[in-house]
Amino acid sequence: MKEILCVDIGGSKYMVGVITPEGKILYSRKVLWKGEAGNPGRILGNIIQTVDEVLEKHPLCRKNPMGMTIPGLADPEKGVWRSSEFLGVFNLPVGSLFQRRYGVPLKMENDANACAYAECFFGEGRMCKDFLYLTVSNSIGGALCLNGEIYTGAWGEAGEFGMCPAEDLLEK
């Protein structure tokens, strides 16, 4: 069975999991952030430590490309985490760092875009060519699906509402 390691980074936590190509979850581990915001080295170090621990339990993942979703702006072609305002991450070359450490490619995408991709292929998005996907958590994000494809625009930011903090809005 093919196993794929995935990392989902959020504003309050990150998750490292192992899935099959069909989307079956074989393993999942959630880790809460503990004051790492503003320290990209510590953020990445904690993620790498968890990935290493998961790879010990699931060594078959070492043979396959890995996936990562990030809050904020991504450059999927270059594997760069361009920005995440509330985590204080800017221009972090995660793709090349993972490639060097693990010897396999890392496919990175903005979290809302990744969710919209999932809707296009597995969810309600299969029934329509055009839709707007919204995510509301620690921040508000979005993705546009036009003609059955995720539209990112000239700078890769189309559909992204920016890092709009939602926590303050919920308290009022």
PLM-predicted stretches and their roles:
Residues 1-3, 56-57:
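Short, Lys/Arg-enriched, disordered terminal segments
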Residues 1, 22, 77-78, 147:
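Residue-level recognition of short loop/turn positions
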Residues 8:
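Conserved catalytic-loop position in the HRD/HxD motif
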Residues 12, 71-74, 137-139:
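Short glycine-rich anion-binding loops that position phosphate/pyrophosphate groups of nucleotides
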Residues 25-62:
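N-terminal phosphate-binding loop and adjacent alpha-helix
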Residues 3-5, 17-19, 28-30, 37-40, ...:
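Glycine/GP-enriched mid-protein hinge/lid loop-to-helix segment characteristic of carbohydrate kinases
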Residues 40-48, 52, 64-66, 72-130:
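Glycine-rich phosphate-binding loop and adjoining helix at the ATP-binding site
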